[in-house]
């Protein structure tokens, strides 16, 4: 499993496809994050629009990315969310923590 990464200007983008609910998907997110982070990007946008299910394991990996960026005065953003993922983010108040990238 591998997630697409892209650099556009000062932002790095990670497109997560499939569910974010296993060690395999979490490891793929970590690798994609490191790929963008190691290229000097401190504003990273997670595109979770294709994710149907996210569990505590996936949330933990998202928070790991957030904490690492915050330590460097960076920002972790998300594309506009929908469905179960949006409900989960709202329930955990992650929608207050992670700004939405509408670009």
Where in this protein do the model-derived segments appear?
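Amphipathic alpha-helical interaction surfaces in cytosolic regulatory modules
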Residues: 20-97
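Short acidic-hydrophobic, aromatic-tinged amphipathic segments that line or gate anion-handling sites
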Residues: 99-103
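STAS-typified acidic loop motif
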Residues: 2-31
């Amino acid at each position: 499993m591998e997630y697409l990464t892209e650099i556009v200007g000062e932002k790095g983008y990670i497109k997560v496809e499939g569910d974010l609910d296993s060690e395999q998907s979490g490891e793929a997110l970590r690798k994609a994050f490191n790929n963008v982070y190691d290229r000097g990007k401190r504003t990273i946008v997670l595109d979770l629009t294709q994710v149907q299910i996210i569990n505590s394991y996936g949330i933990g990996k998202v928070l790991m990315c957030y904490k690492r960026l915050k330590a460097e005065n960076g920002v972790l953003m998300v594309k506009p969310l929908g469905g179960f993922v949006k409900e989960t983010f709202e329930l955990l108040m992650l929608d207050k923590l992670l700004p939405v990238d509408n670009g």
